Amino acid sequence: MFFPKLTASPQQRRTVDRFLGLDRRAGSAMGSFQDMENLWAGGYPALETRPPRGTTAVLKAPHGLVCRDAPVWVDGTALYVNGDRTGLVLTEGGKQLVSMGAYLLIWPDKKYINTQDLTEFGSMEHRTATTGEVTISLCRSGGEELGSYSIGGEAPAAPGTGSLWMDTADGEPVLKRYDGSSWLEVEDVCTKAASAGIGQGFRAGDGVTVEGCETEGLDGLHVLQAVDDDWIVVPVMCRTVGSQTAAVTVTRAIPDMDFVAEQGNRLWGCKYGIVNGEPVNEIYASKLGDFRNWNSFAGLSTDSYAASRGSDGVFTGAAACLGGVIFFKEDCMERVYPSASGAHQIVTVRCPGVKKGCGGSAALVDGTLFYVGANGVYAFDGSMPVCVSQPLGSVRYESAVAAGWNGQYWLAAQDAAGKRHVLVYDTARGLWHRQDDADIMAFTVCGGALYGLTRGGALLDLTGGSGEVEETVRWMAETGELGLSAPENKYLTRLELRVQPETRARLEALVSYDGGRRWEKLGEIIGGDGQTRGCLLHLRPRRCRQLRLRLKGTGRCRVYSLSAVYEKGSDGP
């Protein structure tokens, strides 16, 4: 007796050997993952766990992090350079740390320190107030006395050669000198204010505000022409001179600013809000090469700069890039084009800007600026911003900080539920990976390594592994629904994984069937000594229409390929 020959159900194999990172969108390609932890693109095209992190320092009250040939951080009210405490005393609270030449500048404290000479530090602002007699006299711009002169609306009757006369006939006083035949205007006439200690801490060229002078015309904003400890020279000519005992104050002030950046040997800043009872919506620049002076206006190309803006809303971030400076609001950017002649230009561009609270997310990666906006992460190369965060799905992030490292955009942010995420975007391949929920408040790149400072005070080497390296790394990768990519009925009969775990590293494979929440363990591998070829893990799920695969483990591991073998089912519903 003969039985009919049975025909095996046709099978189809799909193999993935290029893993596409995190993609939360429905119907994402096989090889991408709906969720993951502690993976990165360093092993692409394979799926690889991130390198172990090292804790290089522990802070008590972290407030800021930057690199100046070595890591620099703020802990409480102290500034540390490469672990050494400096003598600079700061206030409590978050800081903006901006580099300019050898100097590190700290906002909102308006303090500075020379990182090549840690004994040179202080305040960028300065103020003196007299306590004794103040003498006002006319002088040359260098401070040389002019001598005696007559004052009046008519010239002296019998002047001698070299006699001086202050002509007050036309309202504005003019000092003239008699050359033997006619009266000629004397140029370079200034006013000197002399009192003990009035000029201490100032330099020629400083833009200062003088207050309290009884002499008309001396109060106001001036650029100092010459300075000594006991006198200052300002470029005005007063009608009357003399002395007073009332206090005179001289102040070199810096405007309050929301964000500060350095570009072209200047500092640039912005401010939106109420200052001294007046609404302010302005962009500022320091004097060229001088971070202390923001009010030096002498008609030179090196002058300070200030400009009001018409766009509404608070400033949300700033970045120096593409040869200029960009100040962001949520719905626009103010692009500053610096000029060597001092004729700086600002253009308002209506486009997605930096989300409020995400000013620290603006970071350059290989010449492209990335930042977190209201609707995702954007890349700006000089034309218009483009959203690159579609694979992250509908999740919106806030309280974001970021840095660029090795062609990658590292982002630490918080979702609407308050959960923290460390996400890494490989800009060359367009791949996202999620690492963990470390509460990182600042990044910096130093010595080729990327550092992150957590709100708990841990200074982490995220890539180099220096310091106290963590013993093991727990990781996880979870696929979307497998088996929904074709309209006909198919059944996933076998999964095959080519993996290479390190010695004593563990990998487990679990599946969830038909959209369920229960996870069933199907296989496990533990790395062995001397294993170089890797392992092949065979998984045989029960018959189902669709399933999700979750890989999880401890220790470093690399997944080279994933194969899914499907068996064709009936054509019925």
Model feature map: region roles:
Residues 51-58, 253-404, 433-434:
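Beta-propeller and closely related beta-pinwheel folds
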